[in-house]
């Protein structure tokens, strides 16, 4: 190939365009100009391609206007009612079709460029959540997918419909979607088969239970998801080689590729999967050299080529971002780095644009002073412009003469369409300046190039908006201005060498907004849009058609480039055609391959090599294969191969050098690695595990730890040394050595991030798993407690509640101030003063709330007077303009799942009243069942509400050491309650023996009180429910103990006289030590005894179940602490130690077959006290950490590594020799429970309580304002957890009636489908489903009970203040026991509690006060003492009482 351009690759593009050499006289003196005036801005202006027909959208009036003469005259489109246009969509593959989308089901379409419009029904309402409403088929314009929503219920469910005949008929495609696309969504993409190209559809499907994006999956159907024999015809593609992936959040079509992005809990790192046929997918691999990751909101898929994908990944602070640009190989899988320090803005736009019509050329802006910007986030960027002619292999400066030119690009968009170029061959324009770097836009001039950017010249002074016409023979520009002072347009007929001006008619002066023309830039007609004074908007039609008489002929044509035009082609809507010619390959046609970097003209290995499929399967590290030489042909390069050896010929490589290289053979041994923490005087540790997500590319197991000790008064001392390990405790090093760290706060949702506060306003943080550390200045002093609150979706959004002091009337007054940052602390804005706490309550999952919603508890006035009541305020715009007081006289609030629970004063009852809200704006009270009187001195505890209902514990016995209560269960919106379990045990602080089992929906363990013994102690029994608390049973006892000795009693299923009873939540030293683990479905451990009731813990033995509590067996004598590993294939037990009883040992016990056999492993030569055993919270690691103290007082950790036991990965469950067995619960599930004011009678039927009435229609419709209808009460209601469909629906066997005022909607629903009625009536809060996932991300696996109404400090100098549980006046406790996760899809759970207290005395403090205290761990140390923080944890907020205000 011949080289064209500086440093160009070896191909040449010949563009047959125009060349003119003669001069003709203008027919007229200038263009014809016509002005039209409008009251509102003409937005979304669109040409029908290859025509003069233009449409625009008046969004103020919701009307569409049309012009058929390139903007000269305008009128509203015919056949469409006024005020219905929600959006305007142009057909992507048919230049005569467009759609007017309304906010209803009836829309309008045109097939004749808008001349006439026809109504059509989309079979679904327009989605308000999705940008892309219509998805078009690239091969058949009649095939369209409509992404809509079904709002038959209170909340809207996203659905997709489709048509194969241009909406003559629309059919349902799929429900519960997050977007659907045709496989053939690009003209270049093909599945390889014509029938699949025509039919294949891809949908992102929401989980049937979980509303969270981490549970979404990709589904493919070739017959529109139809059912055959009751089965939906769909399949899940093997995104990750041999299995599907959950967490699919987006799909993009890029030329001939489909890209799918997935996410997972614990991290914002995403995985990108690529296919070029929808069948074979690959995970996009980025070079290992610099550790670049694709994070949510931090990557941009650029305009790709026909033969590769280009991606820019942000790698710096979000407030002043820069990126790295990568280009893939030809199948879109392996990316190599093209350019570092690309210029980006906060919206993800990248200063990058390809030159239109010419492959391989693009302009990009980079940051020259990148080191300063990385170090100091507020530094001004010095932006420079570069160009490449070989698709990013080499880059060059652009120059005007000898002066370097820098141009404003995509991050400063000043017009519609492309920034620099158009289909006009070789013509490029831009606004910029000469010099060392890019100046402000207002200081720029207009520059032009007619050789595709190889050379430039200044065209006009000042910044301009510009366009190309007549395939480049005409350039038009209008000066840019912030004022309405522009009264002329400029134009050039010689590629910008000379310019003329034309004045706007009648002395019109305007502020230019856009200038545009046809998409192919072949027209001589342009449209200028501008504004002048007030609400005057002008559409100016410019027609240069009469400017010259001569039309270009064949002898005016030559190979591009062509200049000095004095004729017009006048071939409107005919595009220039590029031709290519291939030459012999040279070094310039090759670049470094994946994980190779260029050095001294060679490509050196900088990371693992990719082996061909099957090359290193079952191979040893020294096995060799033919692999990459380090070079690859530049994607898309079609050079002719010469004879002989090639630069990219495969060479010999070793399997030890490849990605996922073979593991060394298993040794069969467990290894123990000890690390002594020298000079440590304290006796405990704060431990923070940085959990990984499924989409994480890291394989480390990082733990952060520091020594701590709790004083008798509850305060905590900490050592200043903070330690880090990246290999689960084999090696430790000290971090932040010179800093006096005060508090350590893991990010509640994104576990790669941890924040460290100091005694000053300096805050350190890491976002890459403690690899690197950055700092920011907080807006106020940290005060006591956790000052930070995090957003569930936006990693960089922070709320800081700190202490501010100022002089008021000569006296210093201190208060808490809430500040908000949207760029991870680089910039702060004050939200509220005199605030108690604030939380982000907006979330993408809860579509009924604004993503920006914040709820705060603050004082009504800005003072600290005792009579200053507290109020709940909310905002949907960060308190910039929106600030609404929602409730007054509030004591506190707590968030749990989708509920916001508020405790407010009830002055009539002289106590507290509880309210709840779903949307953060409307709060409603709850109704308790008949005969359940609630004293104002009672305590309320909200238990885990993960299964579509609130479990509310109400204390009924208040005597100290005898406290107990009833668990009431709500309907799905938390307003009416029925009895679930009476006489449930709680401690003196109203923490409850209640736990939902992780990994299985609906399985709950409680301890109930059956009386007193002779000493006056409570007699407790353990009960279990397998249908979310509707029915309870005792635990069946094993027949014999671990030694084979029979117990003193026996029972097949467990009964009052003989059952297994377990020590529960209230007796745990560490409130996070749960019975089960996230990744181990059905497996539970506990210690207790066999008999008629629970015995002393000193006499307890250890038991386990592998079937979720159906059967149990004894595994150890005495009480042992357990830890799960490798998804339950490893369980480790250690003797339980307490402060009073230090169990000493030098070995641990473990099983690798679910407790069938147990082995001991000696980890120490002398006996030591094991303070704790920890591992990754989900139970997926094969490493464990023992935290020990020796007899001579040394504190140390021991890593136990079980990876040596085996090197064989488990075989696929579907294979014949599978290592898995299919397990499913066998307990019968009841799908119904008693309704409000109904209870089980002696015949186990739900009967109306004597003297009471069922929930009335008026009450139901009032409490559910969006409900359309109600059923006459039958006595039954569905368990909110159940997902059953059809069958015996006991709540719907009665007659349905419309709510008042909803008669018309009722009739429409009744005529639509039973499914619609189901959603409208049965599930009034829709997406309350499966909030167990919410816990996994919101509250991780923290099982510490959140004490509402208390304040405590996690900092070493902040006392743990103990607050009362019950006051004489009133006490209401709202305690959140955080949710469990479903077996197949759910990963972890939590049982943390939150309590809203009215004040009083007594009670110990478990958590830190002030705002969202997220303590650290899954394992804590002593009763009444604080939990240590693990990254998984979210201890929730302490809902403070009045004494919290002391700051």
Swiss-Prot record:
Superkingdom of origin: Eukaryota
Record field: compositional bias (Acidic residues): 1430-1447
Side of membrane Cytoplasmic, spans: 1336-1364
InterPro entries: Sortilin_C, Sortilin_N, VPS10, VPS10-sortilin, WD40/YVTN_repeat-like_dom_sf
Family assignment from sequence similarity: Belongs to the VPS10-related sortilin family.
Compartmental location: Golgi apparatus, trans-Golgi network membrane; Prevacuolar compartment membrane
Keywords (A to Z) from UniProt: Glycoprotein, Golgi apparatus, Membrane, Protein transport, Receptor, Repeat, Signal, Transmembrane, Transmembrane helix, Transport
Positions of the UniProt region annotated as Disordered: 1426-1447
Membrane-spanning intervals of the chain: 1315-1335, 1365-1385
Residues bearing glycans: 306, 331, 864, 973
Pfam families: Sortilin-Vps10, Sortilin_C
Organism expressing this protein natively: Verticillium alfalfae (strain VaMs.102 / ATCC MYA-4576 / FGSC 10136) (Verticillium wilt of alfalfa)
Function: Functions as a sorting receptor in the Golgi compartment required for the intracellular sorting and delivery of soluble vacuolar proteins, like carboxypeptidase Y (CPY) and proteinase A. Executes multiple rounds of sorting by cycling between the late Golgi and a prevacuolar endosome-like compartment.
Taxonomic classification: Eukaryota, Fungi, Dikarya, Ascomycota, Pezizomycotina
Annotated signal sequence range: 1-26
The UniProt record lists the keyword Membrane: yes
GO biological-process terms attached to the record: Golgi to endosome transport; Golgi to vacuole transport; protein targeting to vacuole
Protein name: Vacuolar protein sorting/targeting protein 10
Gene Ontology CC annotations of this record: cytosol; Golgi apparatus; membrane
Main location: Golgi
Mode of membrane association: Multi-pass membrane protein
Annotated BNR repeat ranges: 65-74, 108-119, 386-396, 447-458, 491-500, 723-733, 820-829, 1103-1113
Lumenal side of membrane: 27-1314, 1386-1447
